[in-house]
Design a protein with these regions (language model features):
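Residues that form generic nucleotide/phosphate-binding pockets
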Residues: 8-12, 81, 96, 100
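Pan-zinc metallopeptidase signature
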Residues: 85-94, 98-154
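Post-HExxH zinc-binding segment in Zn-dependent metallohydrolases
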Residues: 66-95
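Active-site scaffold of zinc-dependent metalloenzymes
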Residues: 1-43, 54, 58
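Substrate-binding clefts and substrate-entry loops adjacent to catalytic sites
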Residues: 57-65
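Short N-terminal micro-motifs specific to bacterial/archaeal maturation
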Residues: 35-38, 65, 121-122
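Histidine-centered divalent metal-coordination motifs
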Residues: 49, 53
Length: 154
């Protein structure tokens, strides 16, 4: 049983739309937080994390490292500000939170690997990287929850 109801959360954040969706996510354009299901405390914590993105004004990012910072700050806000409001005791060290952060760190690392030599490259633009080892360049897609693709361009 959840410690708080969805109607209570909707009441507490009238400026946001909360809608059932396929994945937990925040859409800044429509001011909508999407949630998969709310069957467990982990689901509730994930919902609070997405609400944290909204409360922190998170929108777009230009460099992948900015996404990592946004994710970390949203988790910190959920842990320090939102969870206590609903009687939840969370820590940044919780396995679920670290697993979520690890998934973004792993995603970032995979994007940065040179498809030519395997060295870690440097991000040049929002969707391209350069290898400092072999000087290859590659484009990446924006996939975070599906298959990451890298396309060598030089």
């Amino acid at each position: 049983m959840l410690s708080v109801s969805l109607p209570q959360i909707k009441h507490d954040f009238p400026e946001l739309q909360l809608k059932e969706g396929e994945v937990f996510s925040w859409n800044p354009n429509s001011q909508t937080v999407y949630y998969e299901k709310l069957d467990s405390q982990e689901d509730l914590v994930q919902l609070l994390h997405e609400i944290a993105h909204a409360k922190l004004g998170h929108k777009n990012y230009q460099h992948d490292i900015q996404l990592i910072e946004m994710e970390r700050s949203a988790w910190e806000y959920a842990v320090d500000t939102l969870a206590p409001k609903y009687g939840l005791t969370l820590s940044m060290d919780d396995d679920n939170i670290q697993d979520c952060l690890d998934s973004y760190r792993d995603w970032l690392h995979k994007r940065s690997l040179c498809p030519q030599c395997g060295a870690v490259g440097l991000q040049a633009t929002a969707s391209s990287y350069r290898c400092i080892n072999c000087h290859s360049e590659w484009r990446v897609n924006q996939a975070k929850s599906c298959q990451l693709k890298r396309y060598q361009i030089k």
